């Protein structure tokens, strides 16, 4: 019983303590919060008081430091001479017009072609010419560090106290100087710059004087009036020189790239048909993989993500890819229509000849049936032969257009830079061998002899050199059109791969290769071709041959 009483007493005391703590905690929290608020308020007030007194002092000290560094380097005894200021302007690229050589693909410095005199009234129409200039008003005004915020905008407020003893000298030089008409759009030399600020009488430029010149120097640097691009007077001669250099390198690269065609033609007679079929299955897949990979991983990213490409421009470049697809579709469709009408005309002519022959010979009904059967058999066999022939011609023309676009891409790349041209040539070379072997598979299945393949390979290579000539000319004379050529090339590559090569992979004759083995070989070739193009796209900068030159403009 006694234990229960003690337990109840302890429980009552604990409950009482808990209630007291629950009541006191909000009050303690409020007092602590108020103390923190008061402390923060006092700190903020002290910071504001410190800022109003010391903020600009620190700015003055920083300004004085940089002025001291400049005057130590270009001045003498704390002042700048005429020669010292001229040396400073020369190190900044000011004081005289200098020629700036612009490389292809680089952004040009924004320059203005303004070279006329204008009045200060153009910028301040509300101020008459008889009034004192605002600069002099700010120089005559007196202010203290504790001045009002309205006084902070005056020029003398931002002068370091150590420099204010030079202010009277500045005012005396600026007071009688007319500021109505100055050449602000020209590249000012030292004499013109000093005359604009009324400092022509000053034998030495003090730090106070120099603070007046700084905005003019910054404007001259930002506007680029002292820069003149080489395109203004000497780009024509360098364009012709760059065209010849690009044409030479691109032709040499295309000559090396054309070697896989000869290799493929040399390998064909040495291999048995069954072995050649097994070898060509992965090669056809590799041709599709390299063509699609080159278009999607190399050409389109280079064109769409070029410099100064906005969203609308990127959309139109994507439309250019679609234009390449449509262009080759129209070309091959016209080729097929021509072959179709030619076959119709041939059938009609054969039928008329057969009827005339039957009428002249007066053959028996049995002979007529035999002749009719022959005509029917020819009609049945001709569509298949026509389909194979049309496919072969489409592959030949597609290969010619492919080489033409290859030449365009290589010519444009070499016209922009040698390293970029070699990088594009490496990419084209990597997919040229499987592409040529894939074309060879289609043409051999159509029954083309090796001699005919050799002739058309030579004609296709000539189209490549035509593309090199056109690409070099476009890249040098119309460099802004280079991305559009790349996107058009990408569209042609996609069409050749997906419309010509892919159907042959899916529906072509298997020969002695089983369907499963054929599928595995084609899938392996497709992945290999895509992997090759991916590696080139990712490590293009590493595999590009460095010649110590970034552009043809340096040659």
Swiss-Prot record:
This is Zinc transporter ZIP5. Residues 264-314, 430-452, 504-518 are cytoplasmic. GO terms for biological process: intracellular monoatomic cation homeostasis; zinc ion import across plasma membrane. The chain crosses the membrane at residues 243-263, 315-335, 409-429, 453-473, 483-503, 519-539. It comes from Danio rerio (Zebrafish). Residues 108-148, 363-383 are annotated as: Disordered. One of its GO terms (cellular component) is basolateral plasma membrane. It catalyses: Zn(2+)(in) = Zn(2+)(out). It is a multi-pass membrane protein. The gene is slc39a5. Uniporter that transports zinc(2+) into polarized cells of enterocytes, pancreatic acinar and endoderm cells across the basolateral membrane and participates, notably, in zinc excretion from the intestine by the uptake of zinc from the blood into the intestine. The transport mechanism is temperature- and concentration-dependent and saturable. Mediates zinc homeostasis that is essential for venous angiogenesis. Belongs to the ZIP transporter (TC 2.A.5) family. Residues 1-242, 336-408, 474-482, 540-555 are extracellular. Disruption phenotype: Homozygous knockout fishes laking develop normally until 48 hpf, when they develop cardiac ischaemia. Residues 363-374 have a biased composition (Polar residues). It is found in: Basolateral cell membrane.
